[in-house]
């Protein structure tokens, strides 16, 4: 039986106070007329690959990269595969549904998710559809791959597991959601036979990997305010495991570090984070909801540096590349900072003003050893290289690694005449019936023992 540690909510109040919401958003900070020119940028190639997010901000489309191939989703349902060397189109597949997230890969399959809750597996070499299945609700976060399973949090709060070899459902757990939520969800992370997610109530939940029984509930943000917007404390940034630190961050809440084995809270700092984070050499890089960049020491939570040059410019999640921290903004600029001290090193205009929709960049940037892969909101995909002589670095990419477990070598296509019926575009607050029901947890917060062992 898995050991449980019980703790009451008041003990956490001192460090889990949520910040006030921004009812009146200031205008974006104007760009400097004479920015630093300490970064050298080269566009290696660019390719028109569909319609991007279709001008709709709730479509979190971004490329994925594996086996020298770039996989690009689009709001209109088109999926592309490009050669990393020159951007040449290898294949394209009309999935027949509105793709809404960054795909993930396993063996020879690329897993795409849609706003209608459809999961589609496509062969990475020839673009053939391998299988298709339905999730409980809209998919707004990248599917997580571990061993031969796909783990997913959908917008209705459900957490589900699917067999990556054929798309069959392994288990699904329904969870309540607040009155209003952000149009995004955090991806699950797998740790010690537990599927862990951050939910829209600002809590970390854990489920047994085999059956979906809920064993962990740790709040990292507490709602305040009178309006539904003021009470929003969604966890939408993907959790990160680095050494023995498990990092979660919430909107209008906090960024926290938990011990990966005991579940003990090591530190918590007030923050408001929506986008994914980056980690390198023991430093966590974040973009706050007001587009301030902030770096934290992973051991203590102390601030390493802050940078407010781009406040309110709707910048993307940060990435680490060649000693630089790189973000993009709503006007299609790339911005470069020294990862050691936050010094602003310059910008580069990637998209042109003639681009339709926003001509900006809002999706996740993807660093690779060949360059940074970028899908602009208008559907143009780029491979960009950048470096600065003011930055010294040991490796092109960060030292953060994602454990995908062990999977089969190949996934084969299923015989399907037509796509299965999708669910409604956006989930309501209604709790859905699922195969596995979550265990009720009321007044007491349950913090699970994260130590290794088979699930109970």
Curated annotation (Swiss-Prot):
The keyword Membrane applies. Keywords: Cell outer membrane, Lipoprotein, Membrane, Palmitate, Signal. It is a lipid-anchor. It comes from the Bacteria. Part of the outer membrane protein assembly complex, which is involved in assembly and insertion of beta-barrel proteins into the outer membrane. Belongs to the BamB family. GO terms for biological process: Gram-negative-bacterium-type cell outer membrane assembly; protein insertion into membrane. Part of the Bam complex. It is found in: Cell outer membrane. The keyword Membrane applies. It comes from Francisella tularensis subsp. tularensis (strain SCHU S4 / Schu 4). Coiled coil: none annotated. Residues 1-19 form the signal peptide. The gene is bamB. A lipid is attached at residue 20 (N-palmitoyl cysteine). A lipid is attached at residue 20 (S-diacylglycerol cysteine). This is Outer membrane protein assembly factor BamB. GO terms for cellular component: cell outer membrane.
